[in-house]
């Protein structure tokens, strides 16, 4: 098991590093988008095929309506004696359908990050895909369930592999600046293995004037 997980961390062989660009985290998404600044705190729990352990991260998102840009980091500590993997990266999303007048939202997503861990090569991950969500009119709470489909390319030591994955999740707002998010991410690793990550978190949404 330790050898397999080292291969995962190195991003070579049959699988890539855990989850999306931030190791140990789902591919977070919000097809609806928005305006202002959102600060998110995240927790990820990979399954056995990903090496278990715990991941913690933080993200900052600038929303400009249809376009959103995010920067963030995560620290994933796999089970056993494997080294902690730290990743820094970002993503950008563009809403192509939806907005305040439509309950259905569709967006495109592209992201990337660089991950490092002691004793293994650094890994670069690129994610590209899109998602769809519904804006549900729930009293006192904003609810956005979504599904995302994305390909994930993982490159380390001159070797690149490609995996397909999907994410189901929901973003919740509680009528003010506070909100929550939850997602489950699944990635096909080949040889009958499927990596799964459950992620949860809280976020603060600041509707600041952006002069646009």
What is each PLM-predicted segment?
Residues 53-55, 66, 85-89, 103-105, ...:
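Short connector loops at helix/strand junctions that flank enzyme active sites
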């Amino acid at each position: 098991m330790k050898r397999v997980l080292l291969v995962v961390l190195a991003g070579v062989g049959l699988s890539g590093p855990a989850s999306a660009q931030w190791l140990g985290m789902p591919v977070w998404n919000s097809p609806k988008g928005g305006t202002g600044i959102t600060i998110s705190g995240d927790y990820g729990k990979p399954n056995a095929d990903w090496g278990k352990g715990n991941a913690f991260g933080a993200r900052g998102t600038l929303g400009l309506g249809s376009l959103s840009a995010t920067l963030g980091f995560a620290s994933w500590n796999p089970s056993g004696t494997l080294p902690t993997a730290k990743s820094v990266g970002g993503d950008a999303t563009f809403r192509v359908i939806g907005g305040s007048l439509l309950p259905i939202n569709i967006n495109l997503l592209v992201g990337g990050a660089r991950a490092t861990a002691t004793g293994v090569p650094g890994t670069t991950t690129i994610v590209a895909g899109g998602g769809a969500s519904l804006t549900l009119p729930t009293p006192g709470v904003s609810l956005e369930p979504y599904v995302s489909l994305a390909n994930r390319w993982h490159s380390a030591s001159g070797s690149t592999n490609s995996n397909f994955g999907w994410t189901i999740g929901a973003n919740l707002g509680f009528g003010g600046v506070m909100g929550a998010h939850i997602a489950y991410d699944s990635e096909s690793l080949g040889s009958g293995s499927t990596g799964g990550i459950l992620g949860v978190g809280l976020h603060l949404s600041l509707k600041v004037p952006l002069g646009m």
